[in-house]
């Protein structure tokens, strides 16, 4: 019997946008099983990270509804993520190209790392900025803030 190819990615997946779906679809094309390790709240241990907007159970349900994802497991700490990687022994890890040359949890473990491109143009930050800009534009009393966000988005 041929061994199943298992891929995984990890993150908090707060606001699911088309870029995630493109990434999940591409990942699933190259494996038999695609697993997502879902970070409950990255802000709890790293103050530079934002607290997720969407509750964990809703993020879990959303990810499980995406047909390219076979399994979702929740973790809180980087130690728990490492334990999941060691337990499942995946063949491939999917990481965003922004991690090239950086250290990350489990970078000393066997899974081959495949970096994904952001050529699709989507990011959670961009999505949050777009929502904020639309909200501001609909409230003329804060026009200066809207103009600030527009300039910021043009620079990103």
Please report, for each region that a protein language model flagged, where it lies by residue:
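Nucleotidyltransferase catalytic core that binds NTPs
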Residues: 1-156
């Amino acid at each position: 019997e041929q061994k199943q190819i298992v891929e995984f990615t990890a993150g908090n997946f707060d606001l699911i946008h088309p870029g995630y779906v493109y990434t999940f679809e591409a990942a699933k094309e190259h494996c038999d099983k695609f697993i997502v390790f879902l970070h409950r709240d990255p802000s709890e241990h790293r103050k530079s990270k934002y607290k997720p907007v969407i509750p964990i159970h809703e993020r879990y349900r959303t990810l499980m509804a995406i047909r390219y994802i076979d399994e979702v497991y929740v973790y809180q700490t980087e130690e728990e993520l490492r334990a999941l990687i060691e337990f499942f022994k995946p063949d491939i890890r999917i990481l965003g190209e922004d991690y090239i040359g950086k250290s990350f949890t489990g970078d000393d473990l066997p899974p081959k790392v495949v970096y994904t491109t952001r050529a699709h143009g989507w990011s959670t930050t961009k999505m949050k900025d777009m929502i904020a800009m639309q909200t501001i534009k609909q409230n003329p009393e804060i026009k200066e803030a809207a103009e600030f966000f527009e300039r910021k988005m043009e620079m990103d």
